[in-house]
Amino acid sequence: MSESLRIIFAGTPDFAARHLDALLSSGHNVVGVFTQPDRPAGRGKKLMPSPVKVLAEEKGLPVFQPVSLRPQENQQLVADLQADVMVVVAYGLILPKAVLEMPRLGCINVHGSLLPRWRGAAPIQRSLWAGDAETGVTIMQMDVGLDTGDMLYKLSCPITAEDTSGTLYDKLAELGPQGLITTLKQLADGTAKPEVQDETLVTYAEKLSKEEARIDWSLSAAQLERYIRAFNPWPMSWLEIERQPVKVWKASVIDTATNAAPGTILEANKQGIQVATGDGILNLLSLQPAGKKAMSAQDLLNSRREWFVPGNRLA
């Protein structure tokens, strides 16, 4: 076995917790865990710990929850742990230059894309949104830029025609820990080979918004079907009927030309709700009216057929 490293782990959501879990089984010494402060969640707005905090406390690890790492006293928390390396996975706080330089081997990050493609906040969703054939994880050495550091290790996986951001997230949550453990071994052995990112290949994965997820019928059916998968499970593609938002969970493309204006309902039957787009027909298969559970088009038509009269246009 390689040298056992003293590791600080910094992360917040379930995706990060899966990486911490792998680290704890790897023989390395996790000396401290940084995660975001508890946040109000649920209907009662009760303060809830992050998945990383829950796991760290279960395992008896010291947990730190600073609001920022800019204050000197919070940076001292990192320095006092005398770590060999800091592993950062979906932490959500900026690491100042002073913190990046504290561990002997620096700070490394698990990023959910094949860098330099999709630097930024929403790499999983944007890879689907753009119609990429594959994605993966990149383990990189962190610097002060946004996902600009040297790449240490990559693992890729295909994006299938059925993938949603939810299923891709799960795939990358399996790949990430594998890549992380391999990278740590290479760092410990001195065999890591940093690779500079090619700036000519950079794309940016901008944050998603609920407004962006509103269905724009002027786009092609193929684009819309992809966006529906990219925005599932958040923020969810949606359309508005009688001033109510209706989420769309699943749709398919019917490769038939139509002269109808985009947004025109062509048919509504047990096969789905067929709507004209800027190019081709989108068949809505699973929808969720406000305050209800997701249901098949057939079930929605049974209760709300007046919403989907052929010839009418959806906004």
From Swiss-Prot:
Q: Which GO terms describe its molecular function?
A: methionyl-tRNA formyltransferase activity
User: Any transmembrane segments, and where?
Assistant: none
Q: Per its database record, what is this protein's job?
A: Attaches a formyl group to the free amino group of methionyl-tRNA(fMet). The formyl group appears to play a dual role in the initiator identity of N-formylmethionyl-tRNA by promoting its recognition by IF2 and preventing the misappropriation of this tRNA by the elongation apparatus.
Q: Where is the signal peptide?
A: none
- Superkingdom in the source lineage: Bacteria
Has keyword Cell wall biogenesis/degradation?
no
Which family is it part of?
A: Belongs to the Fmt family.
* Keyword list, A-Z: Protein biosynthesis, Transferase
Positions of (6S)-5,6,7,8-tetrahydrofolate binding: 113-116
Under catalytic activity, the entry for this protein gives:
L-methionyl-tRNA(fMet) + (6R)-10-formyltetrahydrofolate = N-formyl-L-methionyl-tRNA(fMet) + (6S)-5,6,7,8-tetrahydrofolate + H(+)
> What is the name of this protein?
Methionyl-tRNA formyltransferase
Q: Which species expresses this protein natively? A: Shigella boydii serotype 4 (strain Sb227)
- Database matches in PANTHER family: METHIONYL-TRNA FORMYLTRANSFERASE, METHIONYL-TRNA FORMYLTRANSFERASE, MITOCHONDRIAL
Would you name any one GO CC term? cytosol
Q: What is its EC number?
A: 2.1.2.9
Residues forming coiled coils: none
